[in-house]
A protein has these predicted regions:
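Functional transmembrane core segments of multi-pass inner-membrane proteins
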Residues: 8, 99-100, 104-204, 244-250
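C-terminal ends of transmembrane helices
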Residues: 20-26, 61-69, 109-119, 161-170, ...
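Membrane-proximal soluble regions of multi-pass membrane proteins
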Residues: 17-74, 223
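Hydrophobic alpha-helical transmembrane segments
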Residues: 1-14, 90-91, 135-141, 230-250
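Alpha-helical membrane-inserting segments
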Residues: 19, 23, 85, 89, ...
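Transmembrane helix-loop junctions in multipass membrane proteins, especially transporters and channels
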Residues: 25-33, 91-95, 117, 142-143, ...
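Short microdomains enriched in Cys/His and/or Lys/Arg
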Residues: 58-98
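Interfacial loop-to-transmembrane junctions
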Residues: 211-233
Length: 250
């Protein structure tokens, strides 16, 4: 079993490296194939050993081998998180068909986190790709009842759209469409829980930032990472969280 976990971790960090490329290039409308990976500062094309996920960053001490400019920590961090999420997905779900939903689900969240942190943008191309993928997957591996996906998508979109109107643009269009996509994968209860958790985590982060004077009340904070955390917790722990809440209020 250790080798299986190791396999998912290695596959995860490899895909994590690719997701970094997708999250950084697609918002700029650049090809994810050409040009090949290079230093954004000096243009140095990376050798194969400079592309090894996580380890190349450590071996190069976080700097470009050519110009010595520091490499963004987002690369190894997101690679590591992807590897851990792939392992955790298998740990929670095992070799079942739902794993084919879980892995794309966490993949979407990694990509939009990279994109939102880097540009405060969640591209439509990414959302459309994963929406089509989830429609196909949920047709084969449906929620119960099957129409829960449609309800989750509709409620996710409307809920965020209303908040965007009430907050006068406080919620971006990418966040609205993202919740619609997540709603299709999660269903009604899942998307509502994801919304609650992401809002709670985002609010606590903002409050902490204001208390420590790292943020002001007018600071623009990308909401994508908080959506990702809330969605992951909802996807893997929906039943446990609702059970805990019911026990709490009874």
């Amino acid at each position: 079993m250790v080798f299986v976990y190791l396999f998912f971790f290695v596959i995860g960090i490899i895909f994590g490296s690719f997701f970094n490329v997708v999250g950084l290039r697609i918002p700029k409308k650049r090809s994810i194939v050409q040009p090949r990976s290079h230093c954004p500062h000096c243009g140095h094309f990376l050798s194969w050993y400079e592309l090894i996920p996580i380890f190349s960053y450590v071996l190069q001490k976080g700097k470009c081998r050519s110009c010595r400019v520091p490499i963004s920590a987002i690369y190894p961090v997101m690679e590591l998180i992807t590897g851990l999420l792939f392992v955790f997905s298998f740990y929670k779900i095992g070799f079942s068909k739902e794993l084919l939903v879980a892995l794309p689900f966490v993949s979407l969240l990694i990509i939009i986190t990279v994109s939102d942190l880097s540009y405060k943008l969640i591209p439509n191309r990414i959302l459309i790709f994963f929406f089509v993928l989830f429609v196909l997957l949920r047709t084969w591996i449906p929620l119960h009842p099957w129409y829960d996906s449609i309800i989750g998508m509709t409620v996710g979109f409307i809920l965020l759209y209303i908040i965007a109107i009430v907050s006068n643009g406080g919620m971006g269009g990418g966040d609205i469409k993202l919740f619609a996509v997540l709603g299709y994968a999660l269903g009604l209860k899942g998307v509502l829980l994801a919304f609650f958790l992401s809002t709670l985590i985002g609010a606590l982060f903002g409050l902490f930032g204001i208390i420590t004077k790292q943020l002001s009340r007018k600071s623009a904070i990308p909401f994508g990472p908080f959506i990702s955390i809330g969605a992951v917790l909802s996807y893997f722990y929906e039943t446990e969280i609702f059970h805990w809440y019911i026990q709490l209020i009874i």
